[in-house]
Amino acid sequence: MQEPATHGDVIEQPLIKVSAFWRMFPAGMRRRWWMFRPFDLIARHFPIFRPRKGLLVVRMDGIGDMMLFRQSLEHYAEVFGVDKADITVLGCDSWRLISPKIFEGYKVITIDEHAYARKLMYRLRVNLMVRRLAPKITACDSYLRRAMMADSLVWVSAASRTVVSMPYVNEPTRSEFTFYLSQVDEVIDTGPYPTHEILRHFRFVSTVAGKNFQPQPPKINWPDQRPALAADGPYAVINPGSNEPGRRWPFASYVAVAEKLLAMGWRVAFVGTRGERWDAKLLDDMARRPGVSDLTGRTTLPELMDLMNHAGLVISNDTGPAHLSIALGAPTLVIVGGGHFTSFVPYPESACPDNARFIYKQMDCYHCFWRCDKRASKFEVFPCVAAIPADDVWTVCESLMNEYQSESARPMAAG
């Protein structure tokens, strides 16, 4: 994959300017936007009587997107001329439990982003809280973002300086993005779709700074809390779930790989949320096998981090825990579909750590944005995911295990 230069471009603001009349009565807005508008205005103009200070970084991301962003944050203090202690990350409740370690040294506030986009009174409370932060600078470099979430929060902060990246815009979202982008100070073009998110984040800080920063892969310095499972020899963590049913590699294929691991004397732990037990009977049958632990719905996010941190192998669909596992340094294989291929996975060569592997089956219909027309229902696995053979996955697993015979995965039998 060709990788763009690290440095991006600042979009000239006249290109996104609109008339005062259009800004007062913008066309093409959703009914919900109009419902929220008077309350957003109240929050934006709520009187604040203390000096503005610090930097607010808006990250309405899932866990995986947050991890792809995390390394670029280390440059924000230098780039924006603020102390690290004066940087506040506004993020999502989904990663609240691990944020004290992931963002050590930064202030972190998390919200329920879905409630923010739907519930009027919750939104008003959050907006007033953001306004009271009184940041001097607000920044947001998400590409695949929602205007009524991320851009609304940037707008409500009413910071003295606002810097955002150019988002992915289509016709249904054009009016909303135009409204918000026309009112920020700087818009950074981080590259065309499907530029990888890691490259985007580093292009953003490079453009603001006026100098290049080399992209860095995700990395977490996680406390060494050895889980009970690690006491009895090597084990693999299998994460077969996803909040998008189509991204779930067939569970029977995961079972086939698990059988090979068990035959080698390894143990297998299935993880995920309780709602992701999408093939419960097959999972229950597997859980009765010696050496198999069904931990779905039974671990907190920090406990899952501990499990992956000591695993000899992690196999996962394209979902948040896969990025966490890679950042922990665990040998990780990610099973990838083509919805927005190369935007998030696989990682670009310049920012791909040695412990990460990605497997996929290229198809002509890649880059469908997960709007697949080749399945009968939204609960079926995407064909590009289902087409990945279990034998191919096992071949990559063997390679990873041979390369990473860590303390938690010493004795290895012949396959």
Stretch-by-stretch model annotation:
Residues M1-G415:
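Catalytic machinery of carbohydrate-active enzymes
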